[in-house]
């Protein structure tokens, strides 16, 4: 493995950032420098940091797609999970000690069930709106799969391992479950309905569970009907108990322009009074959508929720909560009407100490025997898609694409991670080993509208090809914007064909979802290729970035598939 300047940076040495296409230096947009001395040292992103280092934070605390977040607490430790739909592994598990700085520590699901059903991409299906709880030294996560029912996994360590998913309640359209262990030992579950599968929506129900919270034993009881209370599209239920009241937190009004309501009752089955407690108001924080209430050891209450930011997905916000007359008031309630507005900057939670700044990892040197936790596949993975190597690279074996292939939407072996914010550069070093079969390895920014730059073999030459696709889920054909053969070039002082060396693929991601790709043969001079393209969100998720290695079906090409070696992937 060639330890050039970028590799040293991948070892978490100081990075200085610039968005210039023709040089490889970097600086954090927040003015903070990234320093990472090893795997046990806090990783700090060079592109987005919420903690301002002065006792305050800015929202979003994670400017990445953590949809439908939920949080549980164990002492001074907080654990968060979020919707992952059909990304595998799924159910990301993040840890924090101050609710602002978060580290990705594992996943709750390593394989989606039914296994064969999710062996191919099922965009927008899978894991919806999980609920994480800690009870009697066990961690529980419940979620709804709108096509199969409500599942759960358990663990004694939130970093894993977690049990295999077990079906708690079968049915179509059952979503957004939340579990409550009551003071008398009884267990209850609330959930909502997906109208696309069940034919009903905007309502929340509660039913009693068995003592192990493994299956329901009581009838569904309607507790909130948003259809008659002006809270259409009510969903995302979270069930709590505080000071003798039962509370159901839920968003209504839709993801983009909705609000937060809270229903409360002295009795588990109601009747429930309903109140709006958080709305956009005159801020630029649209939505404020579903999330989780948590209380620190110091007695402070906080609400973590998401904001829909289109191509970035559903980013994570943190708002203070004040309890007034038994009702939570979220954010800042300037006019005293009981409904707050979300904050942009605020004093950090009182957790009794000051902790290091930390963010989820983005870059990867592929020096570990396991994939970095930031990566996930587009479907249940198959053996042979990827192998870490003792030589310090990731080997991606080409997967034959479908005979009906027109774009990447239904390719299962896309290795992707979340877009970390709306301005950054991602660069990767790849080598392609082809067996004459038009294999290709690519860097992609993926969504319903996507763009990619690939290195491929065709007609005895290696080519760089820049493509984009609009409305990929509709089966639209890719458009080729540039196709460039790689030839020996004295400018790079490479005596042989460039594909025998590493080829460096780069994308500069800009506000508005704009992408400019470039390439280099020496990792010093980068040349733009193709055109600036606009990408969009996927099905219920933001755009993602990552890698792929594919080949035409053998029945078409008559050739054996090849492979690619990925040396590193740097985000700055």
Annotate each language-model stretch with its function.
Residues 9-16:
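Sec-dependent signal peptide recognition
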Residues 3-9:
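Short, Lys/Arg-enriched N-terminal segments with co-localized hydrophobic residues
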């Amino acid at each position: 493995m060639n330890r050039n300047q970028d590799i040293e940076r991948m070892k978490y040495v100081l990075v200085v950032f610039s968005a210039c296409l023709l040089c490889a230096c970097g600086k954090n947009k927040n003015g903070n420098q990234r320093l990472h001395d090893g795997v046990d040292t806090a990783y700090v992103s060079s592109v987005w940091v919420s903690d301002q280092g002065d006792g305050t934070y800015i929202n979003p605390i994670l400017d990445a797609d953590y949809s439908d977040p939920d949080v549980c607490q164990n002492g001074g430790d907080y654990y968060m999970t979020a919707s992952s739909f059909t990304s595998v592994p799924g159910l990301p598990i993040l840890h924090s000690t101050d609710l602002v700085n978060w580290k990705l520590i594992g996943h709750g699901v390593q394989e989606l069930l039914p296994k064969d059903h999710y062996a191919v991409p099922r965009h927008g299906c899978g894991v919806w709106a999980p609920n994480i709880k800690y009870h009697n030294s066990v961690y529980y996560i419940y979620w709804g799969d709108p096509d199969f029912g409500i599942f759960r996994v358990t663990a004694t360590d939130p970093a894993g391992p977690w049990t295999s998913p077990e079906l708690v309640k079968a049915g179509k359209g059952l979503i957004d479950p939340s579990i409550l262990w009551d003071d008398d030992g009884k267990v209850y579950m609330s959930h909502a309905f997906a109208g696309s599968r069940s034919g009903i929506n905007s309502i929340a129900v509660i039913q009693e569970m068995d003592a192990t919270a493994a299956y329901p034993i009581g009838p569904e009881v309607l507790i909130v009907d948003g259809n008659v209370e002006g809270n259409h599209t009510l969903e995302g239920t979270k069930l709590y108990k505080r000071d003798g009241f039962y509370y159901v937190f839920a968003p209504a009004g839709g993801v983009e322009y909705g609000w937060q309501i809270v229903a409360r009752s002295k009795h588990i089955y109601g009747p429930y009074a309903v109140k709006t407690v958080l709305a956009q108001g005159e801020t630029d924080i649209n939505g404020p959508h579903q999330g989780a209430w948590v209380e620190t050891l110091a007695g402070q209450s906080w609400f973590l929720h998401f904001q829909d930011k289109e191509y970035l997905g559903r980013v994570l916000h943190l708002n203070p909560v004040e309890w007034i007359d038994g009702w939570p008031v979220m954010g800042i309630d300037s006019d005293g009407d009981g409904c707050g507005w979300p904050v942009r900057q605020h004093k950090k939670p009182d957790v009794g100490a000051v902790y290091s700044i930390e963010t989820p990892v983005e870059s990867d040197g592929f020096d570990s025997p396991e994939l970095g936790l930031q990566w996930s596949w587009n479907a249940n993975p198959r053996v042979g898609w990827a192998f870490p190597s003792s030589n310090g690279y990731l080997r991606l074996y080409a997967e034959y694409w479908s005979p009906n292939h027109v774009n990447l939407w239904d390719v299962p072996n896309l290795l992707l991670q979340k877009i970390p914010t709306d301005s950054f550069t991602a660069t990767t070093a790849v080598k392609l080993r082809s067996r004459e079969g038009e294999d290709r390895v690519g860097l992609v920014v993926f969504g319903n509208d996507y763009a990619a730059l690939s290195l491929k073999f065709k007609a005895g030459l290696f080519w760089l090809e820049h493509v984009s696709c609009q409305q990929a889920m509709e089966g639209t054909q890719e458009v080729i914007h540039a196709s460039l053969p790689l030839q020996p070039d004295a400018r790079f002082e490479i005596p042989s064909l460039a594909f025998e060396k590493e080829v460096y693929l780069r994308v500069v991601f800009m506000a508005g979802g704009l992408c400019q790709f470039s390439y280099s043969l020496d990792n010093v001079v980068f040349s733009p290729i193709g055109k600036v393209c606009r990408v969009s969100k996927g099905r219920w998720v933001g755009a993602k970035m990552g890698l792929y290695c594919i080949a035409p079906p053998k029945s078409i090409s008559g050739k054996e598939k090849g492979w690619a070696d990925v040396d590193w992937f740097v985000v700055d």
